[in-house]
Amino acid sequence: MRSKRTRVNNQIRVPEVRLIDEKGEQVGVVRTDRALTMAEEAGLDLVEISPTAKPPVCRIMNFGKYQFEQSKRKAAQKKKQRLVHLKEVKFRPGTDVGDYQVKLRKIATFLDRGDKVKVSLRFRGREMQHRELGLELLGRVKRDLGNIVVEQEPRLEGRQMTMVVMKAKGEGNKTKREDHAEIKD
């Protein structure tokens, strides 16, 4: 497998290259040794920009500066990426008020971090006859959180009812204090 390293100066071993000078203007197809001489006269490097082109495209530039700009560009792209995790918070139909508040705050924390949250509700035994309690609880979670988008509506999977939520984009972001103050009410 060929390495992706950029070839510079004497590493370029093709007879002819399409040359772009330091001002960004096309010089045309020239012999590689002539292009190297022009780069040395300018006090810069001959850098192979597009090795797959016929003939390869080379540019006269400061290679150190080029590498620095490439690394900055990669860092900026990496910074823009955000890995979204799916967190799960489990409830029961008989979840008491105190536990409900704690779990709701945990969901709010996950959403503030930008994660998606799977809210699951587990039914045991005869609780399956009262699925409406589960829908009511998930509806209450949705209401209490306020600034969210339901990605997956509540649905029953065996003995478990699940709903996936995420933070709404573009709406007024509240501070954590305001969120928690609303949850306590």
From Swiss-Prot:
Gene3D superfamilies linked: Translation initiation factor 3 (IF-3), C-terminal domain (3.30.110.10), Translation initiation factor 3 (IF-3), N-terminal domain (3.10.20.80)
Main location: cytoplasm
Keyword Cytoplasm in record: yes
GO molecular function, one term: ribosome binding
Keyword set, alphabetical order: Cytoplasm, Initiation factor, Protein biosynthesis
Location within or outside the cell: Cytoplasm
Cellular component terms per the entry's GO annotation: cytosol
One Gene Ontology term from the biological process aspect of the record: ribosome disassembly
Pfam family, one: IF3_N
Record carries keyword Disulfide bond: no
Annotated InterPro entries: T_IF-3_C_sf, T_IF-3_N_sf, Translation_initiation_fac3_CS, Translation_initiation_fac_3, Translation_initiation_fac_3_C, Translation_initiation_fac_3_N
HAMAP family reported in the protein's UniProt record: IF_3
NCBIfam families: infC
Subunit structure of this chain's protein: Monomer.
Function recorded in the entry: IF-3 binds to the 30S ribosomal subunit and shifts the equilibrium between 70S ribosomes and their 50S and 30S subunits in favor of the free subunits, thus enhancing the availability of 30S subunits on which protein synthesis initiation begins.
Family recorded in the similarity comment: Belongs to the IF-3 family.
Name of the protein in question: Translation initiation factor IF-3
